[in-house]
Amino acid sequence: MFSIQQPLLVFSDLDGTLLDSHSYDWQPAAPWLSRLHEANVPVILCSSKTSAEMLYLQKMLGLQGLPLIAENGAVIQLAEQWQNIDGFPRIISGISHSEICQVLNTLREKEHFKFTTFDDVDDATIAEWTGLSRSQAALTQLHEASVTLIWRDSDEHMAQFIARLNELGLQFMQGARFWHVLDASAGKDQAANWIIATYQQLSGRRPTTLGLGDGPNDAPLLEVMDYAVIVKGLNREGVHLHDEDPARVWRTQREGPEGWREGLDHFFSAR
């Protein structure tokens, strides 16, 4: 049993979880966001999005100043009050975006894998793919430590592609709609554990953690949480955890921010 009155951290994915996958609406979650804010519970956004995108969304959601996890854990944006931490304002794990681009271009040219990265197109095309405005779409291209792409080849070739990436110290991660390439050393779980440890060091007590996500790339995050909400999502693969004890994990009946609200209701309203 736990409550929002005890030391608590909430980690949340964005698209398909806190935000509607199509409209990007978050209003169904607004009452809980306000309640968590009033209780001084940090809501830490955790996504495949770039830090530039997430800082914009963080401000829109009233969460500015808190830490966040970008690019599937390859980038940690530090909290405003953590200015004494080495690397402030951001910690980047693994090789850079430009280095990953070089690897992908070589694989495409020499081994003929078929894919389109966000670097291959302009913001108008990304806006068409995502439904974002062009100004918001431009923020999706500001990667620092990963590459987002659309796979346009066979499943057989994908297996070969993943094997080649792994040989080169990279990983291929499936999001709600796109695929992401990042350093094998990075991950939402490692980033979350680092943030949890930092809060513990600052307060002297390990906070209880609750994570919410809807896609396969959220599984590593949810695995390291004390409690997890798997929001009903669009991805056919879904989310599967090693420990799905009903006392720890809740699968929602609703999608997006309504599912987010349902998950918070489940764990807190009856407590």
UniProtKB/Swiss-Prot annotation:
GO biological process terms on file: mannosylglycerate biosynthetic process
Chief subcellular location: cytoplasm
Location within or outside the cell: Cytoplasm
Family to which the UniProt record says this protein belongs: Belongs to the HAD-like hydrolase superfamily. MPGP family.
Catalytic residue list: 13 (nucleophile)
GO MF annotations, alphabetized: magnesium ion binding; mannosyl-3-phosphoglycerate phosphatase activity
EC numbers, comma separated: 3.1.3.70
SUPFAM superfamilies (alphabetical): HAD-like (SSF56784)
Cofactors (names): Mg(2+)
Protein name per its UniProtKB record: Mannosyl-3-phosphoglycerate phosphatase
Lineage: Bacteria, Pseudomonadati, Pseudomonadota, Gammaproteobacteria, Enterobacterales
Catalytic activity: 2-O-(alpha-D-mannosyl)-3-phosphoglycerate + H2O = (2R)-2-O-(alpha-D-mannosyl)-glycerate + phosphate
EC category: hydrolase
Species this protein is from: Escherichia coli O127:H6 (strain E2348/69 / EPEC)
Annotated Pfam families: Hydrolase_3
Residues holding Mg(2+): 13, 15, 214
Protein keywords: Cytoplasm, Hydrolase, Magnesium, Metal-binding
Source taxon at top rank: Bacteria
